């Protein structure tokens, strides 16, 4: 691990802790008769445990040693939940910061999990698929020895460098190690649908970003603070990172909300098109060519394009991309954090002083863990969502339409009738549940932001809600 990578993880952890400490100060100033003591605050802030595992895998005629991490931040609810990332710059501070963020995120959107996070120091691009599978299965064995993967104790999910494939390997290895475990497939989420996954999980975080923006723009008082006009239609959007989250957020905003994605930043440059980028075509180009070079509108400029003029900035890649160095130059009145921790604590202060509104990560990217919760429930219940009620709903709506047609002596247009009687499929129910979660959560955050003097911004408001809920949970446990 390079020194710079360790320092970046340390800065990220300090940003999370700074946000927490600010929330505690604001809570104690707001609720004078319900103080959060320093002892309990410290208990909530620090990670309960962090495990470092080192294991060997014999590949290519030699023994390679790999280092992995799994941090458990808070067990006020179990199981604890959080992704596993495969990246060469994974470090303990980063993993602990992400685990803490998971605790606050779950509390904010009322998902009954504690926070956890894991990582493996590896560059997946350096290994073949069979080699990566062997490494992943060995890592799973090490986690399973310590109950760091378990359907009722610790449930991993995809993150940077991992996806459905890796989750299927991990679940299968856990099942092999625990053949009598009835709920074995609930040991991870983000699996392929064919292996107990849920429809809509892949798009969930990006879809949640879309729903978060819709919720924000449905609150005129909040929108007025940005100086933007109501509605997403025609809003110019910059997206940094077209991975899974950035791609789905950009795709849905452009195709369903008529927003204009004018800039997409990637490792090998930026695509610029003021009339709106074809996100699906760009994604195909990246998959076929390994980058954005050669796509219409390509310019060699990189991170400085975060400072381009637009209405909404969506950092959707890694943490700490907006720092005190570039924060003074950001020109979008609204930032929504699709990535975890993309804005440093120092940059956050600068942006707020400049009047820029930030929709924080612990709310904005909670779509992933929300739908992971739905998947976990599906695995425990062992039944697909909608299987019991879909046809009954269709029968009721058909009877209603038949009655109306009989009374009026007229027939419904076929397309309207078909939409009205169609029972909800699993993905319909998942999207409905996710939208309900994001809208209800924003209502709570917005109320605190607008009603409480100490909640000067959305991040502080969201952290106040999350920390208070965790504290109340601990207090009811007698801690």
Question: Which positions does each model-derived feature cover?
Answer:
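Glycine-rich phosphate/diphosphate-binding loop of Rossmann-like nucleotide-binding domains
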Residues: 196-309
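Conserved active-site and cofactor/substrate-binding residues in soluble primary-metabolism enzymes
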Residues: 11, 15-18, 35, 90-93, ...
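Rossmann-like adenosine-cofactor binding region
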Residues: 269-358, 363
């Amino acid at each position: 691990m390079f020194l710079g990578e360790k320092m970046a993880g340390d800065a990220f952890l300090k940003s999370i802790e700074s946000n927490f400490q600010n929330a505690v100060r604001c809570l104690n100033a707001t609720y004078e008769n319900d103080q959060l003591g320093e002892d309990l605050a410290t208990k909530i802030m620090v990670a309960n445990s962090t495990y470092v595992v080192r294991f060997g895998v014999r590949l290519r005629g030699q023994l390679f040693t790999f280092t992995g991490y799994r941090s458990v931040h808070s067990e006020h609810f179990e199981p604890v939940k959080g992704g596993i990332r495969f990246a060469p710059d994974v470090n303990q501070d980063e993993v602990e910061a992400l685990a803490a963020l998971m605790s606050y995120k779950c509390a904010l959107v009322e998902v009954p999990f504690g926070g956890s996070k894991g990582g493996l120091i590896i560059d997946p691009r350096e290994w073949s698929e069979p080699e990566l599978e062997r490494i992943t299965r060995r890592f799973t064995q090490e986690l399973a020895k310590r109950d760091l993967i378990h359907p009722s104790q610790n449930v991993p999910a995809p993150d940077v460098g991992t996806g459905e494939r890796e989750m299927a390997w991990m679940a299968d290895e856990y099942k092999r190690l625990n053949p009598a475990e009835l709920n074995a497939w609930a040991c991870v989420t983000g699996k392929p649908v064919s292996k107990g996954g849920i429809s809509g999980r892949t798009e969930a975080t990006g879809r949640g970003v879309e729903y978060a923006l819709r919720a924000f723009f449905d609150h005129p008082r909040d929108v007025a603070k940005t100086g933007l006009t109501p509605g997403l239609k025609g809003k110019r959007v910059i997206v940094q990172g077209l991975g899974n989250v950035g791609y789905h957020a950009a795709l849905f905003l452009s195709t369903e909300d008529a927003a204009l994605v004018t800039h997409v930043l990637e490792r090998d440059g930026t695509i610029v098109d003021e009339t709106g980028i074809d996100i699906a075509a760009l994604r195909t180009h990246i998959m076929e060519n390994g980058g954005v070079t050669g796509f219409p509108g390509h310019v060699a400029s990189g991170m400085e394009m975060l400072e381009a003029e637009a209405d909404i900035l969506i950092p959707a890649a890694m943490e700490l991309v907006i720092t005190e160095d570039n924060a003074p130059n950001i020109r979008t009145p609204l930032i929504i954090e699709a990535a975890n921790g993309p804005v440093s604590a120092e940059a956050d202060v600068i942006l707020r002083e400049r009047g820029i509104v930030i929709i924080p990560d612990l709310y904005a990217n909670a779509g992933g863990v929300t739908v992971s919760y739905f998947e976990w429930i599906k695995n425990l219940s062992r039944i697909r969502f909608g299987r019991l009620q879909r046809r009954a709903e269709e029968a009721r709506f058909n009877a209603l339409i038949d009655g109306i047609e009989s009374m009026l002596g007229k027939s419904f247009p076929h397309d309207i009738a078909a939409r009205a009687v169609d029972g909800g499929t699993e993905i319909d129910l998942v999207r409905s549940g996710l939208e309900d979660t994001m809208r209800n959560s924003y209502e709570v955050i917005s109320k605190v932001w607008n009603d409480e003097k100490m909640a000067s911004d959305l991040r502080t408001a969201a952290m106040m809600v999350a920390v208070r809920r965790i504290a109340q949970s601990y207090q009811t446990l007698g801690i």
